[in-house]
C-alpha cells in the first residue's frame, strides 16, 4: 500500500494523461460514442467534470455529499475541454495546498485518507482519459509507469461490493497484455479494437 502515499503524484499523472487524450476534442466530436455504453463524448466530459468537482469538494471541505463543480481556473466560453483543463488545474492546486495525506476525508458514506481519495481519483480519471482518447480517435495507451502503480491498487478500492454502478465487470483478455491494457480491462473496458474481418467477412 506504499503507493497510496503518492496520491498527488498519481493524480497529477492521471490528469496529464487525460488532458492529452482530450486535446483533439472539438465541438464536432462531442456526439461521438465512447466506450461507456450510452454516453457520447459530451456526456463523458460532463461526468469527468462532476467527478473532479466531488474530489475538489472532498479535498477542500473534508467531505463530499454531492456533485459540485469546483471554482477552478477560468476557461474561455462553453468549451468542455477547456473547462476540464481549468478544473483539473484547480483540483491539483487544491490538493497541493491541502493538509497531511493521512487526514480523513468523507465521501458520501465512506471515510478515506486524503491520499486514498487522490488515488481513487487517479484511477477514475485515468480510465476516463482512456475513454476520451478512444472517442477522439486516438486510443492512447495508459502510460506503463502509471498503470504499474494503479493496477495492484485498483482491486483494493474497486471490489465486487463497490463496482456496481461505477464500472462494468472486468473484461477477460485472450492473451498477454500490457499493464495499461490490464488496467483498462479490469475497469470493464475492451482495450483492443475489434479484429478486422477477413477476406470472407468473418
What are these model-derived regions, one by one?
Residues 47-48:
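Glycine-rich loop at the start of a catalytic domain that most often binds anionic cofactors/ligands
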Residues 44:
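Extended, alpha-helix-rich binding/interface surfaces that flank or overlap catalytic cores
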Residues 1-10, 14-17, 24-37, 57-202:
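Structured surface interface patches that mediate subunit assembly and partner/cofactor docking
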Amino acid at each position: 500500500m506504499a503507493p497510496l502515499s503518492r496520491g498527488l503524484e498519481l493524480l497529477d499523472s492521471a490528469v496529464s494523461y487525460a488532458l492529452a487524450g482530450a486535446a483533439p476534442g472539438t465541438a464536432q466530436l462531442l456526439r461521438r460514442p465512447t466506450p461507456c455504453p450510452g454516453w457520447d463524448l459530451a456526456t463523458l466530459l460532463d461526468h469527468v467534470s462532476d467527478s473532479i468537482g466531488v474530489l475538489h469538494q472532498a479535498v477542500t471541505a473534508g467531505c463530499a455529499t454531492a456533485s459540485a463543480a469546483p471554482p477552478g481556473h477560468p476557461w474561455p466560453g462553453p468549451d468542455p475541454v477547456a473547462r476540464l483543463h481549468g478544473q483539473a488545474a484547480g483540483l491539483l492546486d487544491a490538493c497541493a495546498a491541502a493538509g497531511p495525506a493521512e487526514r480523513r476525508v468523507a465521501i458520501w458514506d465512506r471515510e478515506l485518507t486524503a491520499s486514498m481519495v487522490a488515488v481513487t481519483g487517479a484511477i477514475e480519471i485515468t480510465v476516463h482519459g482512456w475513454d476520451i482518447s478512444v472517442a477522439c480517435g486516438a486510443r492512447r495507451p495508459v502510460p506503463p509507469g502509471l498503470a504499474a502503480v494503479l493496477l495492484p491498487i485498483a482491486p483494493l478500492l474497486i471490489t465486487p461490493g463497490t463496482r456496481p454502478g461505477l464500472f462494468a465487470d472486468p473484461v477477460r483478455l485472450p492473451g498477454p497484455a500490457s499493464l495499461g491494457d490490464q488496467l483498462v480491462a479490469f475497469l470493464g473496458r475492451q482495450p483492443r479494437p475489434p479484429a478486422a474481418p477477413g477476406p470472407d467477412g468473418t
